[in-house]
């Protein structure tokens, strides 16, 4: 296994408050058991809350999206509470199968058998719908064990949004604002590539939905998100004098149907920016609002921030270096292009080791690397695997 360290110094991670038998996460103490695998370096990220910092790139993008939807249709924007959730909240209440790979210790950070660090914003979906919210946005830090490179990090930030209403009010609730939004998008000159068949066999309407109602929900979804694309990319994407282009692609997601991915043509290439769709009725039923219908979307804030600010490495978001942080500000919005600062030349280190059995997962090794070197390692590459003979 080859490691590519980043320039800098190793940093000690405090484990104050923890013991050999307990683990401390966000002020709560948990008894260690056979499921516990959340390391101190990950737990130390919890208080940072980058999405709540108004002058941080993640916080800037979150606030821009929240402000846009508040002006459009009065969406309520929320920040998720503690990332410590139960297995029931993160998996069971959302219909994850008992053998779903996302439940694996190789993918998820467990505090004990019953508690973990949320892996998606949807862990709070049932609670939000149950509170009666119909137009909402939720931003959160989420945690997943992952590989080591410039585009992956075990802590990242998601933003989820939904617009629902009672079934009998669907046509009147969605239709009027949709017509107004479609007209505004057309006036702005957005070029929309969307020749998908409505309710076609490859991306059908749900059996529980009247086709006319489903069609207006899809139109509402597309109008709102086309408007969001304009708000985020409109000025930057027209630097070359060409109109902004967006395209809609059929997709498959477990909680929506029909489902779509949205791509924007930005600086010479198509970029996927979010996934969305009409909410599955059984998902709303699990949340106790089966009498309602509507749409939802989800996006990664890091992905948008990396594109809009030209940030080349996802790990830079966690930097406390003033050379990084001073480049951004809430008052400047998107008027910032990241300027790289010097780093020492790369250094390669090769490591060889024997595995006692085949159950060892690559993510287990990545975790060891992060614990020892923090974010100093840029990349890990498996150079060769030698089978045991005899």
Give the location of each predicted region.
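TRNA-recognition modules of translation machinery and tRNA-sensing kinases, especially anticodon-binding
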Residues: 3-385
């Amino acid at each position: 296994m080859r490691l590519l360290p980043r320039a800098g110094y190793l940093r000690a991670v405090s484990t104050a408050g923890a013991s050999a038998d307990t683990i401390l996460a966000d002020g709560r103490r948990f008894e260690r058991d056979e499921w516990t695998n959340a390391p101190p370096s990950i737990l130390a990220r919890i208080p940072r809350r980058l999405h709540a910092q108004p002058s941080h790139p993640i916080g800037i993008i979150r606030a821009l999206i929240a402000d846009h939807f508040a002006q459009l249709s009065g969406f309520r924007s929320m920040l998720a509470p503690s990332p410590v959730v139960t297995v029931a909240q993160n998996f069971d209440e959302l219909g994850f199968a008992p053998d779903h790979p996302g439940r694996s210790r190789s993918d998820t950070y467990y505090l004990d058998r019953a508690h973990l660090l949320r892996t998606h914003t949807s862990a709070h979906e049932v609670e939000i719908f149950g509170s009666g919210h119909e137009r909402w946005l939720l931003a959160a830090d989420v945690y997943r064990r992952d590989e080591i490179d410039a585009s992956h990090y075990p802590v990242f930030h998601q933003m989820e949004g939904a617009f629902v209403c009672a079934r009998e009010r669907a046509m009147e609730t969605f239709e009027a604002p949709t017509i107004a939004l479609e007209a505004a998008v057309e006036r702005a000159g957005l070029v929309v590539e969307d020749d998908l068949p409505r309710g076609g066999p490859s991306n059908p309407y749900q059996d529980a939905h009247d086709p006319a109602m489903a069609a207006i929900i899809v139109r509402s979804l597309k109008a709102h998100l086309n408007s969001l694309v304009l708000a985020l990319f409109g000025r930057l994407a027209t630097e070359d004098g060409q109109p902004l282009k967006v395209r809609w692609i059929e997709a498959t997601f477990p909680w929506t149907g029909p489902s779509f991915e949205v791509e924007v043509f930005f600086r010479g290439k198509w970029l996927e920016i979010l996934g969305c769709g009409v909410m599955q009725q059984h998902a709303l039923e699990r949340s106790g609002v089966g009498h309602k219908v509507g749409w939802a979307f989800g996006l990664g804030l890091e992905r948008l921030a990396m594109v809009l600010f030209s940030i080349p490495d996802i790990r830079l978001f966690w930097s406390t270096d003033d050379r990084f942080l001073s480049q951004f500000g809430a008052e400047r919005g998107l008027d910032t292009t990241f300027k790289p600062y010097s780093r020492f030349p790369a250094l390669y280190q090769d490591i060889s080791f024997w595995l006692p059995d085949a159950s060892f997962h690559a993510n287990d090794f990545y975790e060891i690397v992060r614990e020892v070197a923090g974010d100093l390692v840029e990349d890990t590459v498996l150079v060769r695997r030698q089978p045991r003979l005899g």
